Amino acid sequence: MGGASIWHWIVVGVIVMLLFGRGKVSELMGDVAKGIKAFKKGMADEDQPQAPVANQSPPPVSATEPVRTLPPHQGEPAPAANASVDRKVG
């Protein structure tokens, strides 16, 4: 009970043939076969090693302006112009 026997599959096949017709079913199966072939071809292409890229040097870098380095920071930072400084004179 509940098992799918060969007769169940035959009935399902007949119903599909009646609903879609012979032309649609064969067209659908042809599309499935093309998809499987494309998948297999893609897998075969992936397995083959790809041709190595020719030894190319990187493109030359155009020097428009020389790079400047900043001297290391020394001392305390200068107070901001609008900051008030409270000092006791004493």
Swiss-Prot record:
It is a single-pass membrane protein. GO terms for cellular component: TAT protein transport complex. InterPro entries: TatA/B/E (IPR003369), TatA/E (IPR006312). It is found in: Cell inner membrane. The keyword Protein transport applies. GO terms for biological process: protein transport by the Tat complex. Keywords: Cell inner membrane, Cell membrane, Membrane, Protein transport, Translocation, Transmembrane, Transmembrane helix, Transport. GO terms for molecular function: protein transmembrane transporter activity. Its main location: membrane. Residues 42-90 are annotated as: Disordered. The chain crosses the membrane at residues 1-21. The Tat system comprises two distinct complexes: a TatABC complex, containing multiple copies of TatA, TatB and TatC subunits, and a separate TatA complex, containing only TatA subunits. Substrates initially bind to the TatABC complex, which probably triggers association of the separate TatA complex to form the active translocon. Belongs to the TatA/E family. Part of the twin-arginine translocation (Tat) system that transports large folded proteins containing a characteristic twin-arginine motif in their signal peptide across membranes. TatA could form the protein-conducting channel of the Tat system. This is Sec-independent protein translocase protein TatA.
